[in-house]
C-alpha cells in the first residue's frame, strides 16, 4: 500500500508526454520471460499465470513493488521490436529462488506516458527515437512501470506509465 501511495504521489507531479533525464540507483528485478503473443491464445494464458505467480511471490517475499513491470531488452530496441521481453517486480538484493536481472545504476531517459497499454509500444518507439535524436547512446534495457493502472482507474486512457531507458551521455 505504501508503494502504491508513492506511485500516486509521483503521478501527480509529472507531465504526461514529457521526456527528461533521471538518475536511478541499482535495482534488483525478479523476472519471468514474456510469451510470444503472436503465435497462440495459449500463450496469453501462460502470461497471465506468470504474472500472477510473480505478484504472489512478491507479496510473500516482501517485494517493494507489487505491480509487475515490463523490460524490453536493448537488443530488441535496436531491432525496432517494442514487445516486452520480461515482466518483473523489484526485489531486495540477495533475493533467491527466482530468475533475477539487475537494473544498473545510471542515467535514464524517462517518458511519462498517459494512455492504454496498447499505446505503450508507440511511446517506447518515441522514447528510443528521442534518445537517438539527442545524440545519446542506448546503454541498456527499457523498463516500464505502472504509476496509474487498471487498479487505480477504470479508464485505460488515464493509465500513466513510466518508461525508463538506460543511456550513455556524452
Where in this protein do the model-derived segments appear?
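A solvent-exposed interaction/effector surface
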Residues: 1-170
Amino acid at each position: 500500500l505504501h508503494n502504491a501511495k508513492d506511485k500516486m504521489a509521483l503521478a501527480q507531479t509529472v507531465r504526461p508526454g514529457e521526456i527528461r533525464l533521471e538518475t536511478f540507483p541499482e535495482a534488483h528485478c525478479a523476472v519471468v520471460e514474456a510469451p510470444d503473443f503472436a503465435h497462440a491464445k495459449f500463450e496469453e494464458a501462460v502470461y497471465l499465470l506468470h504474472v500472477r505467480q510473480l505478484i504472489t511471490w512478491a507479496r510473500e517475499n516482501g517485494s517493494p513493488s507489487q505491480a509487475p513491470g515490463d523490460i524490453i531488452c536493448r537488443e530488441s530496441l535496436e531491432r525496432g521490436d517494442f514487445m516486452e521481453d520480461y515482466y518483473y517486480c523489484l526485489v531486495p538484493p540477495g533475493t533467491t529462488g527466482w530468475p533475477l536481472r539487475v537494473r544498473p545504476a545510471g542515467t535514464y531517459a524517462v517518458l511519462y506516458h498517459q494512455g492504454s497499454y496498447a499505446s505503450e509500444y508507440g511511446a517506447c518507439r518515441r522514447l528510443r527515437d528521442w534518445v537517438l535524436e539527442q545524440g545519446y547512446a542506448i546503454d541498456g534495457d527499457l523498463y516500464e512501470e505502472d504509476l496509474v493502472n487498471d487498479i487505480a482507474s477504470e479508464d485505460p486512457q488515464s493509465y500513466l506509465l513510466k518508461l525508463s531507458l538506460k543511456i550513455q551521455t556524452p
